[in-house]
């Protein structure tokens, strides 16, 4: 069921039928290249949109009891309300507000609900893990909203920042990719997908005749399709920046409509290229194969069985399909639950939801990414020491180390942008320090 927050009803009378004209609110004209005169007109249009949209939202809130009747997160988002969907270009305060509330404002994005488990399983507390790291300094440098360490099945560190707490939801960005790939494994075991060597177009007929016609499910999972894509987060003309504003062809899903027009750059299986668009297609493939929305299948195969403590949401495209490559909103503890679920083989009543051998393949290097010691599996970033991670822009992550029974969850809003090199390096160093702390503790227990 599409998530319709209370604010949706609060805004209906004030805004009329604005949602029927998405181009009026969701354009990214302020960032588009063009002649100086055109650019000035575009910037003026955006300013008028911001004024109109701000008045619209405040009027809607006031009409049903006023600003202070809204929850803190929604007030924070409205106070810095972005004028478009191009979050790659939002200001730091806008991101701070929005990352905890993307699913609160349907004018920005709509979502489907993933209900909490009927049998929630709170994380048991453990002894604090002795760390040399100054946690306060590390979190300040990362601009962390949440930092959790689960080791040996127990919660050994749980800290929050940016005026966020564990009761809220924080967006996943590309961490969702690893959730989507897990649903591929589930669909394979359930018989909805016959083989990873099947053609993608067997499941998404609208891709027939496109560059994806001869691409296998496996190649899509490992981002080795050979289809051209630009994932440059700093470029407003990149595919990752433009596809949200694409107007789909009549009768086609928005995500498929954009991807089917892309040209081939290399033969299938010969080159790895990171592409959020390809994971969007993975999500579409699962939906087409199972006949179920991704949110429904996630609730059935993961959220319920794993004992998730809170509701989650999954943002949907203009045509109403969950965006497989991005944007689950969940509590930090439930991200930790997901890490534990994967660490323990995604088992329900002793049986894994994925086929035998799935995790060995999914979490080890299937594609060379050009970094010694690292690779890419089935939508997981892999390390030669056996650890692996789900990663999202601006500092989202679930790091899993089976050898040490370790899960680390990070939610953040990096100051240096989507792929802040300094913040990324500091996080990798933190992972190593946690691993060393676990090793030292285990050694002391043996002595």
Residue ranges, per PLM feature:
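Active-site-proximal loop and beta-strand segments within enzyme catalytic domains
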Residues: 136-137, 165-167, 187-271
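N-terminal leader/targeting segments and the immediately adjacent pre-domain N-terminus
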Residues: 26-165, 193, 222, 260, ...
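Active-site helix/loop module of the DD-peptidase/beta-lactamase fold
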Residues: 171, 190-228, 261, 288-326, ...
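Catalytic-site signature segments of enzymes, centered on catalytic residues
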Residues: 166-167, 232-234, 241-319, 326
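Short, low-complexity intrinsically disordered segments enriched in A/P/G/S/L with frequent Arg
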Residues: 3-4, 21, 30, 39
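Active-site Gly/Thr loop motif
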Residues: 309-312, 356-407
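Active-site-proximal alpha-helical segments within enzyme catalytic domains
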Residues: 278-285, 324-347, 396-413
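Active-site SXXK
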Residues: 153, 170-196, 220, 282-286, ...
